Amino acid sequence: PMATEKSVGEGEVSEGLCDYYREKTAGGYFGLVITEHSYINKEGQASVGQVSVSCDTDIEGLKRLVEVVHVSGSKVIAQINHAGGKAICALDGSVTAPAPTGMPYTTTRGEAVEAHTMSQAEIDQVIADFAAAARRVKAAGYDGVEIHSAHGYLLNQFYSPISNRREDSYTGETIEGRT
């Protein structure tokens, strides 16, 4: 997947985004396309221009994107994500980004952000938001969903004992806590 940052407004699918996938899938050379990582809630947005799967109002635009890929004969999978400590919600300093452990993080653009240790309620909400995003993806007609858990984003932060210094059941000290 590529991160084109071609969404508009609050992460809505744009004509430019559709044009990008139309061009890339033209000719039917791809059996499967995994679209760029899309945020499951506003607190988990990794960059301006990232596609949203965080609201039911996103479904219509996502349907347009699915149709563009399906016209080429390709299957399409959505990649859903939460940026965790790398979230841009913290760039203006008014809030801190949610993360396994409160500590400084760096966004994908190199900006420093401060993160706070997620509460159990926040963890439960993120789990619910991933499930809701997957339902939206299904409603939009995608052929599958991939949960992004790499590149230092939230799930990867939980997997790493470097960024996960929790002392509860989500501890980064044990395999069980990280899974």
Q: What role is predicted for each listed range?
A:
Residues 48-57, 115-127, 172-176:
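The substrate-binding groove and active-site-proximal loops of carbohydrate-active enzymes
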Residues 11-13, 127-131, 136-138, 170-179:
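Active-site glycine- and acidic-residue-rich loops that bind
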Residues 3-6, 82-85, 149-153:
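Glycine-rich beta-alpha junction loops
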Residues 41-45, 88-89, 154-158, 162:
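Short acidic/His/Gly/Ser-rich catalytic and metal-binding motifs that mark active-site loops
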Residues 118, 146-179:
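Polysaccharide-binding and catalytic clefts of secreted carbohydrate-active enzymes
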